[in-house]
Amino acid sequence: MAKAKFERNKPHVNVGTIGHVDHGKTTLTAAIATVAAKTFGGEAKDYAAIDSAPEEKARGITINTSHIEYDTADRHYAHVDCPGHADYVKNMITGAAQMDGAILVVSATDGPMPQTREHILLSRQVGVPYIMVFMNKCDMVDDEELLELVEMEVRELLSDYDFPGDDTPIIKGSALEALNGKDGKYGEPAVIELLNTLDTYIPEPERDIDKPFLMPIEDVFSISGRGTVVTGRVESGIVKVGDEIEIVGIRDTQKTTCTGVEMFRKLLDEGRAGENCGVLLRGTKREDVQRGQVLAKPGSITPHTKFDAEVYVLSKEEGGRHTPFLNGYRPQFYFRTTDVTGAISLQEGTEMVMPGDNVEMSVELIHPIAMDKGLRFAIREGGRTVGAGVVANVKD
C-alpha cells in the first residue's frame, strides 16, 4: 500500500487535553477523533488505542503519551493525551509535546478538582497560551443551575491564574454520548462545536521561521584568511549574509556581522530555522566566542542569571537522585548546548524536594544565559540528568 502523502496545505496546530483524573480526557480525545473523521474525513481512533499510551523518552524522562491527529475544515491538529497526572507534569515541563492551546476537561458532576487547578497553574507556568473548556458528563446533571455553578467556578479558577476566565469558551457536552454517535445536544453536536471553537479561539501559531533569528552555538572554528565560524542548528528565524547579529550569553553581549553561511561545505546566502549551518562572523576572534552562547537578531533576547522555574525532579527509578535536595542546592543547569552552575532557592514553606516531585523554584546562575520565558533546561549532577525545568519568569 502506498504511503499517504503528508499534505501541508492546511495550517498545523498542536493541542492537548488537560484536567483532573477520570473527568473524561481520554474519552473526549476518542470522541474528537471519531467525530472529526465522520465530519471532515480522516481515520477514527478508538478509546483503547488512545488509552494504551506508549512510553517515550524526553530528556531522559519516561513519559506515557498518546498522539492522535485529526482535521477540521480549516486545520490539521496534532493532539496529545496523557493517562496519568505525573505524565502531564513531565510532558508540560519538558515540552515533549508543546501545546498551542489546551482543552481543559471538567466533569459537570464534580466541578473543578485539585488537578484541574494544578493543570491550569502548569499551563500558566510553562506558557500554554490558550485554554478552552469542555464541561463533560452534562448528561448526568439534571439541574441547569448546577451546570451554571460549575461554569462559574471554572471561570474563576482560570482568572485566578491570569487566563481570561470571563471570555473563555466553555462547551457543555458528554464525550461518551458523542463517542457513541448520539446526536442530542450533548453528543456529536457538542464535539462539532468544540472543533469549530478550536479553529476560531486558538490563533494560528507563529512558525519558527517567522520568529527572530536565534542559533545556539555548538562549535567555534578559526579558518585562516576568512575568520571565525560558529556552527549550530538554527532554532528560529533566518540569518542572511550581511545581517547584523549579537552574540549573547556567558560574557558581555557583542555585536558582529554575518559575512557568510555554509551548509555541507556549500556557501549559501541564508540559514533558516531547522538547518544545521556554519555562520562566518566579521572581526570576531576565536577566543571571543564559546559554546553555550547564542547568535541572535539584535535586541531580540537578553542574558539573565536569575529566573523562576517550574521543575520536575526525576525519581530514583528514572535514574534520578535517591535522596531529597534542600535550599541552596547547586547543580548544573543545561541550557541548549552547555552546563552552567546555579544555586536553587525554594519557595517559603518548602524545606526540601523529593525525587519524583514537581516544584516551583528560583535560580541564580554563575554566568548569564540568553533566555526567555518558556526556555526548557535540564538539571544535571556530574553529567547525569536529575531534573527537567522550564523558565516561568525572567528576573534580571
From Swiss-Prot:
Cell location: Cytoplasm
A Pfam family this chain is assigned to: GTP_EFTU_D2
Keyword GTP-binding among UniProt keywords: yes
Enzyme class: hydrolase
Stretches for region G2: 60-64
Residue numbers spanned by region G3: 81-84
InterPro entries on file: EF-Tu_GTP-bd (IPR041709), EF-Tu_GTPase (IPR050055), EFTu-like_2 (IPR004161), EFTU_2 (IPR033720), G_TR_CS (IPR031157), P-loop_NTPase (IPR027417), Small_GTP-bd (IPR005225), T_Tr_GTP-bd_dom (IPR000795)
Catalyzed chemical reaction(s): GTP + H2O = GDP + phosphate + H(+)
Domain tr-type G: 10-206
Annotated region (G5), positions in chain: 174-176
Keywords noted in UniProt: Cytoplasm, Elongation factor, GTP-binding, Hydrolase, Magnesium, Metal-binding, Nucleotide-binding, Protein biosynthesis
Disulfide bridge map: none
Region (G1): 19-26
Function: GTP hydrolase that promotes the GTP-dependent binding of aminoacyl-tRNA to the A-site of ribosomes during protein biosynthesis.
Homology family: Belongs to the TRAFAC class translation factor GTPase superfamily. Classic translation factor GTPase family. EF-Tu/EF-1A subfamily.
Subunit structure, as described in the record: Monomer.
Protein name stated in the entry: Elongation factor Tu 2
Species this chain originates from: Psychrobacter sp. (strain PRwf-1)
Gene name of this polypeptide: tuf2
